[in-house]
Amino acid sequence: MMSKLGVLLTICLLLFPLTAVSLDGDQPADLPELRAQDFAPERSPWFDPVRRCCSQDCRVCIPCCPY
């Protein structure tokens, strides 16, 4: 029974390696279009200089202020 379990585990690891699991869930999303434009949030009309974040339209302006 244990050898069957070992074979099954080996097959599963070969078909779905642990490196395929993304472990960077706490990282912010990569926005290449903003990086390519040399985006500076300080020049955005939604940027709040006091809080150092964007108050509106978080799709365009980063970092977004918490509510």
From Swiss-Prot:
Which protein are we looking at?
Conotoxin TsMMSK-B022
Tissue spec: Expressed by the venom duct.
Listed GO molecular functions?
Answer: ion channel inhibitor activity; toxin activity
Residue stretch(es) of the prosequence: 23-50
The primary site where this protein sits is secreted
Name the source organism.
Answer: Conus tessulatus (Tessellate cone)
Q: Which residues carry this modification: 4-hydroxyproline?
A: 63
Q: Which domain of life is it from?
A: Eukaryota
Keywords in alphabetical order = Cleavage on pair of basic residues, Disulfide bond, Hydroxylation, Neurotoxin, Secreted, Signal, Toxin
Which cystines does this chain contain?
53-65, 54-61, 58-64
Family assignment?
Belongs to the conotoxin M superfamily.
Query: Is Signal found in the keyword set?
Result: yes
Listed under GO cellular component are:
extracellular region
Q: Which residues form the signal peptide?
A: 1-22
Pfam families recorded for this chain? Conotoxin
Question: Where, per UniProt, does this protein localize?
Answer: Secreted
Can you quote the domain comment?
Answer: The cysteine framework is III (CC-C-C-CC). Classified in the M-2 branch, since 2 residues stand between the fourth and the fifth cysteine residues.
Alphabetical list of InterPro entries matching this protein: 4Fe4S_Fe-S-bd, Conotoxin
Is Signal included in the keywords of this UniProt record? yes
